[in-house]
Amino acid sequence: MAGELKVLNALDSAKTQWYHFTAIVIAGMGFFTDAYDLFSISLVTKLLGRIYYFNPASKSPGSLPPNVSAAVNGVAFCGTLAGQLFFGWLGDKMGRKKVYGMTLMLMVICCLASGLSFGSSAKGVMATLCFFRFWLGFGIGGDYPLSATIMSEYANKRTRGAFIAAVFAMQGFGNLTGGIVAIIVSAAFKARFDAPAYRDDRAGSTVPQADYAWRIVLMFGAIPALLTYYWRMKMPETARYTALVAKNAKQAAADMTQVLNVEIVEEQEKADEVARREQFGLFSRQFLRRHGRHLLGTTVCWFVLDIAFYSSNLFQKDIYTAVQWLPKADTMSALEEMFKISRAQTLVALCGTIPGYWFTVFFIDIIGRFVIQLGGFFFMTAFMLGLAVPYHHWTTPGNHIGFVVMYAFTFFFANFGPNSTTFIVPAEIFPARLRSTCHGISAAAGKAGAIVGSFGFLYAAQSTDASKTDAGYPPGIGVRNSLFFLAGCNVIGFFFTFLVPESKGKSLEELSGENEDDDDVPEAPSTADHRTAPAPPA
C-alpha cells in the first residue's frame, strides 16, 4: 500500500516547519504574478480605448470596439485554459519540478513582451498585446495544477488545506498590488503631465505620455516571477511523484531526508507494489467508478463559480460607473480615469477580496472544505439577489455605498468559499499519477467559465435601451438581469458541491484510494468511507 511507504508517512505526520513556509512563498509568488497579470488588464482597458480609438467628433472618450475589448480581456483566459490542460498533463508525465520552471519563464518573457508593440497603429498594438497575453495565459495556466499539486504533496495532512489555501491567497495580494502599481503610475504621470477633462479639451485630455503608463503596469508583473525562478529550480521533486509515479522510492527518501532533516530509509519493493496495482488510466472504467463523480463535481463547481467571479471582477469599473461611484468619463482626463478605476479596485481587493482568502486559510482545516464551499455558494447567491432585486434602489443617489458594501461581501464569500476550495480539493482527491492532470481539467473548466463571463458579460450587461448602450454594442439584458443570471450559476454550484468528498484530515493516498486494493473498491463509494459532508457528532 502507498500508506506503508515511510517517506509518505513522514510527510503526512511532519510538524509544520520552515520548508513548508518556503514552499508556500515559492508557489505563492507564482499566483501573485498570475493574479496581477490577469486582473491588471482591467485597469488599463479604458486608457487603451482613449489612446488608440480616439474620435475627435465624439462627445464621449474613445473606447475599445466590442470585438477588440472582448479579445483583450478574454485572450489570456483562452491561453490559461490551454495551459492548464497541457501543463497539467505534462506535470504527470515529466514531473512537477521540470515543468514548473518552464511555466515561470514563459510568464516572465510574455509579461515583458505585453508592454511592447509592433508599430503604433491601433491594429498593430492590439494584435501584439493579444498575442503575448495569450502565451502569458498559457504559462499562467500551467501554474494552477503544478502549484496546487506541489503544495499538496509537500504538506502534512493536518494543515494541508491551510498551506494550499495560503498559496492561492497570494492572488489577493496580486490584485491589490496591481491596483497600487496602477495608482502610483497614473498619479505620477498625472502630476508630471496634467491634462484637462475630455469635455473641456477632447484631444488634450489624453497626453502622449499616457501610452507609457499602461505598458509599465503590465510589464511590472514580470518582476516577482523572475525573483522566484532560482528558488523554484532548487526545490526537489515531490516525494509522491518520485515514489509513486517515477517509481524511485529510494530517491524520494533521500530528497525528503534533506527537507525534513530526519533519516528515512525506504524499501523500493513497496513502491513497486503500489505501481503495479495502480495502473488504470484517466479514461478507464475504474477511474470513472472511483473518481468520475468527483471530477464532475470539481469541474462543474469551478465552471459556474468562475462565470460569476470573473464577469464581476473584470468589469468592476463598469458596475461602479453604473451606480455613479465613478464620475462620468467625459468629466475626467485619461490618467485621472485610470487612477480612479485603480483606486476602486484596490479598495475592493483590500476590503472584500483579501480577507476572504485568509479566512479560508485559518478555518479550512477546522470546519472543512465542504462547509466552506457550500456556505460560500449560498451567501454569494444571497448577496447577488440582494443586489439584483432592489437594483434600482442601489443606483439612486445616496445608496451607492450600500451597493459597494454588498458587492464586497459577495467577493468575501467567493474567496472564503468556492474560489478557494475549487482550487484546493482537486489537488487532494485524485491519484498521484493523475493528480496534476485532473487538477488541470478542473481548472480548465473554471477558465471556460471565466471566458463565458469575460466575453459574455461585455454584451449581457448592456442596457436594454439601445440609446444607453456603450458604443458599438447591441442592447443586452442589463446589469440587474445579469446579476440574476450569476446568482443562478451559484445555485448550480451549491448543488454540485454534494458530489465532492470532504478531504480534511485524510492523507492523499487515503483520499485517492491508493491505499486500497482494486478488489476492495466498491462499485459506488460507500457513505461511511467517502462521506461528502462531515459526520455529525455522536
From Swiss-Prot:
Topological region Extracellular: 45-69, 120-123, 185-210, 316-346, 391-396, 462-481
UniProt feature, compositional bias: Acidic residues: 511-522
GO biological process, one term: phosphate ion transport
Membrane topology per record: Multi-pass membrane protein
CDD domains: MFS_PhT (cd17364)
Cellular component terms per the entry's GO annotation: membrane
Annotated GO MF terms: phosphate transmembrane transporter activity; symporter activity
Primary localization: membrane
Location in or out of the cell: Membrane
Segments of this protein annotated with the region Disordered: 507-538
Transmembrane intervals: 24-44, 70-90, 99-119, 124-144, 164-184, 211-231, 295-315, 347-367, 370-390, 397-417, 441-461, 482-502
Keywords: Membrane, Phosphate transport, Symport, Transmembrane, Transmembrane helix, Transport
Cytoplasmic side: 1-23, 91-98, 145-163, 232-294, 368-369, 418-440, 503-538
Protein function: High-affinity transporter for external inorganic phosphate.
Other observations noted: Although related to the sugar transporter family, it does not transport sugars.
Family per similarity comment: Belongs to the major facilitator superfamily. Phosphate:H(+) symporter (TC 2.A.1.9) family.
Record protein name field: Probable inorganic phosphate transporter 1-4
Species for this entry: Oryza sativa subsp. indica (Rice)
Name of the gene: PHT1-4
